[in-house]
């Protein structure tokens, strides 16, 4: 059996890879590891709207309660809400059933510790070890078996918390919200209406068969159209579990995670709230983002791709904002994970405080053209580019030519016999040529 836990919990095609049996075993092993049998654990369980979430929830809760865990079921709710409610309800852990932005046939199971952080690798390894080795676990009977309790206040608790993360109402703003037929449908329309905004909700029904299909943060085309049609101030697109946000300005242009982070970081710095004047992002954030931050005296630290690496760096350095171009943004003083609703509120509150349109705010950075070319290289040779002097010299030469207004990024594919060559810079034709020549050189040298 391959490793169960990826960078974002256990994920796979529901009922085929992520089966009810596996969900049951994860529940049992998770309940045991979180307490090592020392006390009766309390676990918050939430889910997104996809069809398979009910099936997996029943199996997971059966596993948890069979080890004596008390389960607080919070229903269809955003992933970041589970992280927050785990802390609020003083639970031992939280579990979210969701495959985030993935297609409907997928689902996932993600654990949070009692502080609302994703489980550290060593605890995930321990859960996996128990499942793989079929370790014998306690079998409580009678009153030793746990129960499931449905929370009737979870959505209200989360909405009130979200309101507390900004210091203004949103009266006067007209907002189109795309809920991706997902978990934000239960929160976002209510939240923004209660804050005084005029709300036009799209894809806001809990239709599991439509989650993320032609809508949400990965497909914002319909939202762009609706913002212009309704003459709205902005559009907000969440993904299936609302841990990420992509915005649309009043002209119908996309405002991605890089732009949102730039807007928020510049605003935070002006208020003295940007810790160490630093933002954490991944290697995929555009060079234009880095240049915009530098112009405002803000440092950028880059990590590997994946929000868990961003979060690790934020905790290590004590930084207050970090995220990904995809719209997965963490405001660590507010929540322990990416939270699309918090990101949306921060953006709207900056518009309210400054009186500026979103297109004006987004003009703080220019997205530089980006070219991606694949070099075909055998899997066993993919890491060798690091040792080749000619390749290293060529990369240095290209970056020198761009004089700080461009960059070269080399990333071996994790799944295919390819090395991805990405070049960003001001002149599209020039960087296209650079990327092609560098990919050709890599193929020649490594094959």
Curated annotation (Swiss-Prot):
Activated by phosphorylation. The active site is at 100 (phosphoserine intermediate). Binds 1 Mg(2+) ion per subunit. Mg(2+) binds at residues 100, 239, 241, 243. The modification Phosphoserine is found at residue 100. Pfam families: PGM_PMM_I (PF02878), PGM_PMM_II (PF02879), PGM_PMM_III (PF02880), PGM_PMM_IV (PF00408). Its EC number is 5.4.2.10. Disulfide bonds: none annotated. GO terms for molecular function: magnesium ion binding; phosphoglucosamine mutase activity; phosphomannomutase activity. Keywords: Isomerase, Magnesium, Metal-binding, Phosphoprotein. Its cofactor is Mg(2+). GO terms for biological process: carbohydrate metabolic process; peptidoglycan biosynthetic process; UDP-N-acetylglucosamine biosynthetic process. One of its GO terms (cellular component) is cytosol. InterPro entries: A-D-PHexomutase_a/b/a-I, A-D-PHexomutase_a/b/a-I/II/III, A-D-PHexomutase_a/b/a-II, A-D-PHexomutase_a/b/a-III, A-D-PHexomutase_C, A-D-PHexomutase_C_sf, A-D-PHexomutase_CS, Alpha-D-phosphohexomutase_SF. It catalyses: alpha-D-glucosamine 1-phosphate = D-glucosamine 6-phosphate. Belongs to the phosphohexose mutase family. Catalyzes the conversion of glucosamine-6-phosphate to glucosamine-1-phosphate. This is Phosphoglucosamine mutase. It comes from Caldanaerobacter subterraneus subsp. tengcongensis (strain DSM 15242 / JCM 11007 / NBRC 100824 / MB4). The lineage of its organism: Bacteria, Bacillati, Bacillota, Clostridia, Thermoanaerobacterales.
